[in-house]
Amino acid sequence: MKTIAFDVMGNDFGPQAAVQASLEFVQKNPDFQIILVGDKKEIEKFTKETSQIKILESPNIASSKDGLRQVSKMENSMNSALDLVVEKKADAVLSSGDSGAYLTSALLKVKRLKGILRPAFMPIFPTIVKDKKILVLDVGANLETKVEYLIQWTKLASIFSNKILKVKNPKCALVNIGVEDYKGFDFHKQANEELKQSNANYIGFLEPRNILDGKVDVAVVDGYGGNLILKSMEGAVLALKKVIKESITKTFFRKILALFLKKAFKDAAERLDYRNVGAAWVLGLNGIVVKSHGSNDFKAYLGALEQVKQGINAKVIDVFRETLE
């Protein structure tokens, strides 16, 4: 039985959506069990223990307000979930708690893969090409970025794209303000030259507006810029949905026309719905550590659990270790 440790505390809406997604997930995946970590009384409002659902009492919520170093030593649901992976009682951990606390605790407990300098947050974005995904990293784990980080992230993400997303010889690019070699900061230019000489299928710089074109499989970016890209994309998709809804309900004729276009609108919204992904990998650690959004709903949590399942089934950490040796 494969096991996922799921910290269901610290999100925006309580444990209900996380628990319900877990129940749906184990029903579809009889070879998996989930350990729900959190306030047992709250969790038991929505489920009892079963052969596939276990509950670990750990009601305290991790917060970076307590100090990042200090929070990693405290008793909270996040640390309890991470400890299950460290103690080999779980194959992976998922949490939607405080990002800073999660990254720090995971670094101190799970540790980095041998030779990896810094982990990165890596979501899997949908693109405008049907069934085509792109890996984008780092989206906020590191405010300062060195050339070596970008090189290592490119290598790890290429392996991930190949083994998890089944992309043959993934195309990689560095996100920059332009595609010309002379543009960007010094670390952009140096990393660009080094990646040209590497074994990666590197195509050069990529502008942010082209990330969702579907022509690239891996987009590597500094953590500050990546976080801006992530939040801008989420906001743009939500704004677009709102504008379309307002526009098609303005007149009676548009409402009638919208009925005929309903399936097309639904397909487009589904293709760009980030909830189908639901999470970002903490890439570069010596274990499967996945971070979901604090505002996740049922659908987003289900997408996150599916991501974790893919990583476990592909034995992605073993693949990383073998490749990095």
Swiss-Prot record:
Please give the pathway this protein is involved in: Lipid metabolism; phospholipid metabolism
The GO cellular component terms are: cytoplasm
Disulfide pairs here are: none
**Main localization category:** cytoplasm
Domain of life where this protein originates = Bacteria
What is any Pfam family matched here? FA_synthesis
Subcellular localization(s) per the UniProt record: Cytoplasm
Quickly give the catalysed reaction: a fatty acyl-[ACP] + phosphate = an acyl phosphate + holo-[ACP]
GO molecular function list: phosphate:acyl-[acyl carrier protein] acyltransferase activity
- E.C. designation(s): 2.3.1.274
Ordered alphabetically, the record's keywords are:
Cytoplasm, Lipid biosynthesis, Lipid metabolism, Phospholipid biosynthesis, Phospholipid metabolism, Transferase
Which GO terms of type biological process are on file? fatty acid biosynthetic process; phospholipid biosynthetic process
The residues that cross the membrane are none
* InterPro entries per record: FA_synthesis, Phospholipid_synth_PlsX-like
Main function = Catalyzes the reversible formation of acyl-phosphate (acyl-PO(4)) from acyl-[acyl-carrier-protein] (acyl-ACP). This enzyme utilizes acyl-ACP as fatty acyl donor, but not acyl-CoA.
Matches recorded under NCBIfam families: plsX
Q: How does it assemble?
A: Homodimer. Probably interacts with PlsY.
Family from the record: Belongs to the PlsX family.
**Which PANTHER family does the record cross-reference, listed alphabetically?**
FATTY ACID/PHOSPHOLIPID SYNTHESIS PROTEIN PLSX, PHOSPHATE ACYLTRANSFERASE
This protein's name: Phosphate acyltransferase
Source organism per entry reads Mycoplasmopsis pulmonis (strain UAB CTIP) (Mycoplasma pulmonis)
